Amino acid sequence: MKKNDLEYYDLNADNWWTEGKVLNLSNHLNKYRIDFFSSYIPTWQGIKVLDIGCGGGLASETLAKQEACVTGIDLSLESIKVAQAHARKNHLNIDYYWVFAENLPFAAKKFDAVLCCDVLEHVTDWQKVISEAHRVLKTNGLFFFDTINRSFKSKLIMIWLLEDIVKQIPPGLHDWHKFIKPEELTYTMENNGLNNVVIKGFDLTGGMNWQTLTNILFKGLNPKNKDNKPEPFPIKINEDSSVWYLGKAVKG
């Protein structure tokens, strides 16, 4: 089986905005991500934001609706096309580019904030992505991220449970060996001049609560309620970074 199979994003790009589809789960995750990021940027109005790995534009549109000046980039051309079309439909002014995150086509010190969510574990050279994020950030700009820890628990939950057993995530979408330990990410960020690092757990399982894991096993991450509407599990932002984690750093 091919690992880290990024063709999935091109083949399924039309599902970014379809409720109940795997890619649309990002909309659920973004509620918690952006709430966390907003604790460092109370108002997004006029803030110049780069959304690395924007996909179909879910986070980009959320911030654009809060009057941020948003630019999105992604390696999936079909996802960029979907993002552009959806922004036009909703009369949102967002600039989208089909480019590599390791080689951003932007001037230095252009952005107030850079988002990099569900990206670092997929790219060819995540250290280079960190370097590029630092380059395009203004002094005192904020780097926001989330990614997956390389741990036994992440293999158990993200690979064995969600990919291999319940197939909530398409098998082969991730490569466990490309997951990143928090200390590795912190070391690289600090070496690139991104300091004041804060890391929190982005916890899908309530600290590996067995009742939650059982529910995921039988219902997946996106179960339906009595009205047959998707009702994803609540996410906790806590101190458990053993599977998935998010955070921020500041360019000095």
Name every feature range the model reports, one short phrase each.
Residues T147, K167-E184:
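Acceptor-substrate binding/catalytic loop of class I
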Residues Q127-L142:
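A short glycine-rich, Lys/Arg-flanked "PGG" loop and its adjoining helix->strand segment in the class I
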Residues L58-N103:
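Class I SAM-dependent methyltransferase SAM/SAH-binding core
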Residues N90, Y187, N196-G252:
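A C-terminal cap/extension of S-adenosyl-L-methionine-dependent methyltransferases
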Residues E102-A113:
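A short acidic, Gly/Pro-enriched loop at the edge of an enzyme's catalytic core
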Residues F144-K167:
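Conserved class I S-adenosyl-L-methionine
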Residues N27-I47:
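Conserved alpha-helix/loop element of class I SAM-dependent methyltransferases that forms part
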